[in-house]
């Protein structure tokens, strides 16, 4: 299935008047990265509330034990959230730099 390029271009012009396509793409990617950052931070806060400590401290405890299945699953989910936060922060910086270029 292909996208109707003309219809897409018209939508871009209506929603982002006087912006080049690459500027629009950078803006949309920045918006998505910020949404992802909020999602990962929310997960991180939920796990901090559940376990009463930050990931790195809790991680050492888990790795030194034989955790039950749910704790192990939380480990992977929390690790994904912490990694996602770092990745999204880096991506946001890159995209903001791109937007500042003339």
Would you name each region that the model predicts?
Residues 7, 21, 37-39, 59-62:
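Hydrophobic alpha-helical segments, principally membrane-spanning helices and signal/leader peptides
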Residues 14, 21-23, 34, 45, ...:
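Short linear motifs at secondary-structure transitions and domain/linker junctions
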Residues 23, 30, 37, 64, ...:
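Amphipathic alpha-helical coiled-coil segments with heptad-repeat character
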Residues 26, 30-40, 44-47, 81-88, ...:
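Amphipathic alpha-helical coiled-coil segments
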Residues 46-69:
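Short E/K-rich amphipathic alpha-helical oligomerization segments
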Residues 97-102:
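Short acidic DE-rich linear segments
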């Amino acid at each position: 299935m292909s996208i109707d390029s003309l219809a897409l271009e018209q939508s871009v012009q209506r929603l982002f008047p006087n912006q080049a396509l690459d500027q629009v793409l950078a803006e949309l990617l920045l918006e998505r990265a910020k949404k992802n950052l909020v999602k990962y931070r929310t997960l991180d806060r939920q796990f901090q509330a559940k376990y009463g400590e930050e990931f790195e401290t809790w991680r050492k405890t888990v790795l030194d034990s034989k955790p039950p299945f749910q704790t192990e699953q939380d480990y992977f989910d929390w690790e994904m959230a912490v990694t996602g936060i770092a990745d999204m922060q880096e991506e946001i910086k890159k995209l903001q730099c791109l937007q500042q270029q003339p």
